[in-house]
């Protein structure tokens, strides 16, 4: 997946870095006129939960629909955190969105120890404002910081 992200950045002619943990940051310059804006970080991870799979590298997922929901037999669908990663890549690819400097940080090993995020170099991240795209729902943004905030708002 890290290889794909680097190729994605190259195709869009965006700056990127890859660290020893295979975490990838892709940077998109601000829309002209918005260069002075504070950089925003879109955070996600590329690994998934391999629930119930004896051999995740060689197993297939049997998907089915139940009451309007896609499910998998004996495992997860593997979509965590595919939603966040997809949103971040869509933002990078869409030149119609007005924005300040953007950083998309995609970490590794979130599901089994957070070692990708835990070992990020301070130089890897330029932005100080982070939007965590790892949520269970596509219309929910998860935020955090020094001051607890509780807000439930749907975004479309």
Predicted features and spans:
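TRNA-recognition modules of translation machinery and tRNA-sensing kinases, especially anticodon-binding
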Residues: 142-155
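Short, structured patches in soluble enzyme cores that scaffold and shape functional sites
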Residues: 106-108, 133-135, 155
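Short acidic loop-to-helix transition motifs that present clustered carboxylates
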Residues: 21-25, 111-113, 138
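A non-catalytic alpha/beta surface segment that caps or lines the substrate-entry region
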Residues: 1-38
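Short, glycine-/Ser/Thr-/acidic-enriched flexible segments
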Residues: 31, 47, 138
């Amino acid at each position: 997946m890290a290889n794909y992200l680097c190729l994605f950045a190259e195709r869009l002619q965006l700056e990127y870095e890859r660290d020893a943990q295979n975490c990838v940051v892709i940077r998109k310059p601000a829309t002209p006129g918005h260069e002075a804006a504070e950089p925003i970080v879109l955070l996600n991870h590329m690994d998934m939960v391999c629930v119930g799979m004896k051999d995740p590298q060689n197993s297939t997922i049997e998907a089915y629909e139940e009451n309007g929901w896609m499910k998998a037999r004996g495992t997860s669908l593997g979509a965590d955190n595919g939603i966040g990663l997809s949103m971040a890549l869509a933002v990078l690819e869409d030149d119609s969105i007005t924005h300040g400097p953007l950083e998309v940080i995609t970490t590794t090993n979130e599901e089994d120890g957070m070692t990708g995020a835990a070992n990020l170099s301070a130089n890897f991240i330029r932005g100080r404002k982070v939007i965590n795209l790892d949520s269970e729902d596509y219309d929910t943004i998860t935020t955090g910081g020094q001051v607890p905030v509780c807000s439930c708002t749907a975004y479309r």
